[in-house]
């Protein structure tokens, strides 16, 4: 924080936003005061209700971390910290709708992502095979229908991804890159190493520099998010300007011609298929004469996608 203030805010007269990703197990009062003082936005990783979360997130003694995380989420709420939640959905999660019901009940903004395949992790915990994708297809339909019903009932929706993506369909916005990795954001780890995004943190060979020596621009160009129009594997895909080219970390880990990469692309298309179905239902609902008096606040989608 002090380095960023000195080098970027004071010397270069630029604004900086501080973001912190945490597993949510070590948050205390001093940290919360620091977050508020420095205007941090904190993302807490939690994968769902206790049974789901504790299947993956455990302490060294094997005890699940859910209760500790839940306690600290309440602390963040009471402390006035700007924070959100992030769920990682693994093949072990066979009750997707229950997971999203849990997050909506928390009444905290959240996002989700599917596990990233990696040869350094147990594939049973990260890889969705053909049967897993078939199951996810059905369950994603249930989840999107749930959000659609909430929206029609003018209930609050806390899932940032659903709101943002429906708004993108409504405004016909085009996604030229998948994310801001290495473009307008960098991640720094506890050793002072820079990475384009959090998904690369575990992989030293994806480092693009460090606090002491600065940024290696050639490596930054290699690992930052790419323009989807430059990606040969995306050129014939109908969802390329919705997806933006998918995760750059996975592209390097899997290889964009691999079977695993193609499976990942299939999952992304399934997700957008269900989002498009939800968008069509919402438009039909708005245009139905019997529902004309029910004004749906699209502005909240714009705020969520900002």
Language model features with spans:
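Radical SAM enzyme [4Fe-4S]-AdoMet core and its adjacent flexible, acidic
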Residues: 55-181, 185, 204
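Canonical radical SAM enzyme core domain
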Residues: 1-42, 46-52, 60-68, 87-98, ...
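Generic recognition of stable, solvent-exposed alpha-helical segments in well-folded globular domains
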Residues: 30, 68-71, 94, 98, ...
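C-terminal accessory region of radical SAM enzymes
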Residues: 134-168, 198-244
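Radical SAM enzyme core and accessory elements
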Residues: 154, 191-193, 229-306
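Flexible loop/turn segments at secondary-structure boundaries
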Residues: 23-28, 51-52, 92-94, 119-121, ...
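Active-site and channel-lining beta-strand-loop segments
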Residues: 184-199
């Amino acid at each position: 924080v002090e380095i960023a203030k000195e080098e970027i805010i004071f010397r270069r007269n630029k604004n900086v936003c501080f973001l912190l990703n945490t597993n949510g197990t070590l948050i205390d009062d001093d940290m919360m005061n620091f977050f508020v003082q420095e205007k941090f936005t904190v993302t807490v990783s939690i994968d769902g209700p206790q049974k789901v979360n504790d299947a993956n997130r455990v302490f060294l003694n094997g005890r699940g971390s859910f209760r500790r995380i839940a306690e600290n989420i309440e602390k963040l709420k009471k402390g006035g910290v700007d924070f959100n939640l992030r769920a990682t959905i693994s093949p072990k999660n066979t009750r997707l709708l229950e997971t999203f019901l849990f997050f909506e009940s928390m009444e905290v903004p959240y996002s989700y992502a599917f596990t990233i395949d990696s040869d350094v992790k147990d594939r049973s915990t990260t890889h969705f095979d053909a049967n897993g994708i078939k199951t996810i297809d059905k369950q994603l339909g249930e989840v999107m229908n749930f959000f659609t019903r909430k929206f029609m009932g003018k209930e609050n929706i806390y899932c940032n991804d659903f709101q943002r993506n429906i708004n993108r369909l409504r405004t016909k916005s085009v996604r030229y890159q998948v994310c801001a990795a290495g473009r307008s954001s960098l991640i720094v780890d506890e050793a002072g190493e820079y990475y384009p995004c959090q998904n690369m943190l575990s992989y030293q060979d994806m480092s693009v520099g460090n606090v002491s020596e600065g940024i290696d621009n050639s490596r930054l160009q290699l690992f930052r998010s790419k323009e989807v129009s430059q990606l040969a594997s995306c050129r014939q895909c109908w969802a390329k300007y919705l997806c933006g080219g998918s995760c750059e970390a996975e592209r390097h880990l899997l290889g964009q011609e691999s079977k695993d990469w193609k499976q990942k692309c299939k999952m992304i298309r399934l997700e957008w298929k269900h989002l498009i179905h939800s968008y069509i239902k919402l438009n039909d609902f708005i245009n139905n004469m019997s529902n004309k008096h029910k004004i749906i606040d699209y502005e909240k989608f714009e705020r969520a996608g900002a």
